[in-house]
Design a protein with these regions (language model features):
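Hydrophobic, small-residue-rich transmembrane alpha-helices and their short perimembrane loops
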Residues: 1-88
Length: 88
């Protein structure tokens, strides 16, 4: 009788740990996925404007490249958050 109760408690603890790991995985995927989606939407308008401006004036290529790279740092922040969630 006591062994069955202990076995049930151990099974419940294992299920809670597995559920927690699954939720951590979902949170990490959302962190990277949503930041990637947001960056893609931002790059859509910034990239086309940068290419158009560079086509008109070749001297602003460096500035256009800088404005194109800035939104990509958002994905790096999402990746850092995902790693913190997974390994905490």
């Amino acid at each position: 009788m006591a062994a069955e109760v202990i076995a049930a408690a151990i099974t419940d603890i294992e299920l809670m740990k597995a559920s927690q790991l699954g939720l951590k995985g979902i949170a990490a995927a959302l962190a990277v996925g949503l930041t990637g989606l947001g960056t893609g939407v931002a790059e859509m308008s910034i990239g086309s404007a940068a290419v158009g401006a560079t086509a008109e004036n070749k001297d602003i290529f460096g500035l256009a490249l800088l404005f194109t790279v800035i939104p990509e740092t958002i994905v790096i922040f999402g990746l850092v958050v995902a790693l913190l969630v997974l390994f905490s």
